Regions:
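DNA polymerase processivity clamps
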Residues: 1-247
Length: 247
């Protein structure tokens, strides 16, 4: 299990070895909603900060934000990233020891954090998509997701006959008309809303059962539900499913 942020002993700060800025904070802000404090696996409870980008996943959605700063790869506990954001001061420097990292602010104060030793899984294959062709998300899409979510017992929104629906059976469902959506896919509404700020352009890929989304400096992938499964979808059970391929 992951060690709690408050249980880790902290020594003196790591010496500055690089100049950084608030692009790191923008990256944390974009991907942090996907990390989960106390998750069983470190890669689900942390942000991967690396050269050029930051990555986080909850096992169902993965997002990568490009900050453009050259840094060594490190797995930062979510609580540490939250503390850096809450500090409310501009970032100016970075220190690193391999097992810890220090984030320096403009007034020479700092936040030092231990790093998880685990490796973040290879996520690049998740973005493979033949014929990728993202298009602007329909203007009413997230209004529809919110509207339908309140009527969905499973927390899933379905794409049926040019509409978002709360149930696979249209005669029993609440619906919201949205043109241009692929037929037959279904997504967890909570996960869609988590990435709404980054969900500006999207490619819904029926063959891989994923949606590939893009925003300003960010890309991501969201798994659709398996509608061919004989087991009914259970939102609470799937909250703890960390088998996000290939994780």
């Amino acid at each position: 299990p992951c060690v709690g942020f408050g249980d880790v002993g902290i020594t003196g700060p790591d010496e500055r070895c690089a100049v950084i800025d608030d692009r790191i904070k923008a990256a944390f802000e974009a991907v942090l909603p996907l990390a989960t404090d106390g998750a069983q696996h470190a890669h689900l409870a942390a942000v991967l900060l690396q050269s050029g980008s930051a990555v986080a996943t909850n096992g169902h959605v993965l997002a990568e934000y490009w900050h453009g700063i050259d840094l060594p790869p490190m797995l930062i506990p979510k609580a540490s990233a939250v503390a850096i954001l809450k500090a409310g001061k501009a970032l100016t420097g970075f220190g690193y020891s391999g097992s810890s990292a220090t984030f320096w602010f403009e007034d020479d104060s700092f936040i030092k954090t231990q790093l998880f030793a685990e490796q973040f899984p290879n996520y690049q294959p998740l973005f493979n998509c033949e014929g990728l062709n993202p298009w602007p998300v329909p203007e009413e899409f997230f209004k529809a997701v919110r509207s339908i979510e309140s009527f969905s017992r499973s927390g899933i929104v379905y794409f049926e006959n040019g509409m978002l629906a709360s149930n696979e059976q249209e005669t029993e469902a609440s619906t919201y008309k949205i043109e241009g959506l692929p037929e037959g896919m279904g997504f967890n509404a909570k996960y869609l809303l988590m990435v709404e700020p980054s969900f500006k352009n999207v490619h819904f890929d029926e063959s891989s059962n994923k949606s590939f989304f893009f925003g300003e400096n960010v890309r991501g992938v969201l798994m659709a539900i398996d509608r061919n499964s004989a087991t009914p979808y259970n939102a609470e059970a799937n909250e703890e499913d960390d088998n996000f391929p290939p994780f």
